[in-house]
Swiss-Prot record:
Gene: hisS
Reactions the enzyme catalyzes: tRNA(His) + L-histidine + ATP = L-histidyl-tRNA(His) + AMP + diphosphate + H(+)
Record-given protein name: Histidine--tRNA ligase
GO biological process: histidyl-tRNA aminoacylation
PROSITE patterns with a match to the protein in the record: AA_TRNA_LIGASE_II
Length: 427
């Protein structure tokens, strides 16, 4: 039997992991500059957490979750299909509001959804995102949006459009739902099967349809902005003012909705034409009622966003943004010419590594010529060729592989030079 990766999953190989590290480190750095701390939650949760948190009528809960029962007596568990509900669960369980009135956390996590695999969309994939819990102020919305766009700018992606909308409060959404159903009823026979299913359960999601045959119908539908309460209007206007003052361009799109039921008021999405049909880079919004939906006595205002790493990597590859991102290379490669030299090299490599220096040596017993090829393949900066003569004299030739410049050093000098160069690289 030939074992392979499961459909919708992907190995991240050593030849590409440096790109992932670059993205993750950049993302983590921006989050930390904005005052966010990392959170990690279990990969599976109670199924009820997502049913209540995301909403029974959503596509995710309806058909995309990987759920299982460890045994007939136990409750159903689910591999997390998103991170907001688990983060809110952790916030409530550990009383994080007592630590800080505004809890700001970020995550870089694996997500699981039963979706049709395609470019940038897997069944097991990675997301990064953040949640600001405890503030109902519009500046929290604006900060999260600015944080999201700053991540993409730091990664070199500047060709994007920010779409904004407000979904209002519960009363606004109920009034809009009724008006939307009234509008869509005469067009019901023209709807596709997915939209017909959504008509009763969640008609707002019909506005999110990517079916071009429905574009004209959707264009004429009543907008939720027509039903906003005064407080939501003022909140949304203030968010826009903060973004304008920050110099961030955006488009107010009254057709923008989010695929999860917990969203209220501000909703946003970052899109790029460089991704083709699947143009969304990231998205998020405010979800002030999620805490009470999950059983909390008091509401906890919150806003956040999430973004897929695989899709980000696709666009970065397309824009050639990894050209200067190289795998970590050894500072020094020690090549040996005799058994005695091997023994010395092994001890020296170990000493250098304990000093925090990236150094490599041959583990295959290859010839000197093959070792030199390996040094070049790994892009080592220096190579040190060690034979019995070098060991007897205590003098070693250190060669710079790019310039071919050579210097003669003692063993102590080698350590000093490697330590100095490592310190400079870190600085």
């Amino acid at each position: 039997m030939k074992f392979q990766t499961i459909k919708g999953t992907k190995d991240i190989l050593p030849s590409e992991i440096h790109k992932w590290h670059y993205v993750e480190n950049t993302v983590r750095g921006v989050f930390q500059r904005f005052g966010y701390n990392e959170i990690r939650t279990p990969v599976f949760e109670q199924t009820a957490l997502f049913q209540r948190g995301i909403g029974e009528t959503t596509d995710i809960v309806g058909k995309e979750m990987y759920s299982f029962q460890p045994d007939p007596e136990s409750e159903s568990l689910t591999l997390r299909p998103e991170m907001t509900a688990p983060v809110m669960r952790a916030y409530l369980q550990h009383s994080l509001s007592g630590t800080s009135p505004a809890t700001k956390v970020f995550y870089i996590s694996e997500i699981f959804r039963k979706e049709r695999p395609q470019a940038g969309r897997q069944r097991q994939f990675w997301q990064f995102g953040c949640e600001c819990i405890g503030s109902d102020q519009p500046e929290a919305d604006a900060e999260v949006i600015l944080l999201m766009t700053e991540i993409y700018r730091q990664l070199g992606i500047k060709n994007f459009t920010l779409r904004l909308n407000s979904l209002g409060e519960t009363e606004s959404r109920l009034a809009h739902r009724e008006a939307l159903q009234t509008y869509l009823k005469p067009h019901f026979d023209l709807l596709d099967e997915i939209s017909k299913t959504r008509f009763e359960k969640n008609p707002l999601r019909i506005l999110d349809s990517k079916n071009p045959a429905l574009a004209e119908i959707i264009a004429g539908a009543p907008h939720i902005t027509e039903f906003l309460d005064d407080a939501s209007k003022a909140h949304f206007q203030t968010v826009q003012t903060y973004l304008k003052n920050a110099g961030l361009d955006f488009t107010v799109d009254p057709t923008l909705v989010r695929g999860l039921d917990y969203y209220s008021r501000t909703a946003f999405e970052l899109v790029s034409t460089d991704l083709g049909a699947q143009d969304a880079l990231a998205g998020g919004g405010r979800y002030d009622s999620l805490a009470t939906v999950l059983g909390a006595k008091n509401s906890s205002a919150a806003v956040g966003f999430a973004a897929g790493i695989e899709r980000l990597l696709i666009i970065m590859e397309k824009l050639d943004l990894f050209q200067a991102v190289l795998p970590p290379a050894p500072l020094l490669f020690i090549a040996t010419q005799s058994p005695v030299a091997k023994e010395w090299a092994f001890q020296t490599v170990n000493r250098l590594r304990t000093e925090g220096i990236h150094v490599a040596l041959d583990l295959l017993g290859r010839s000197l010529k093959a070792q030199m090829r390996e040094a070049n393949r790994t892009h080592a900066k220096y190579v040190l060729i060690v034979g019995e003569e070098e060991l007897s004299t205590g003098r070693f030739q250190l060669k710079h592989l790019q310039t071919s410049e050579q210097v003669e050093l003692s063993e102590a000098d080698i350590f000093t030079k490697m330590q100095t160069e490592t310190t400079q690289d870190l600085g």
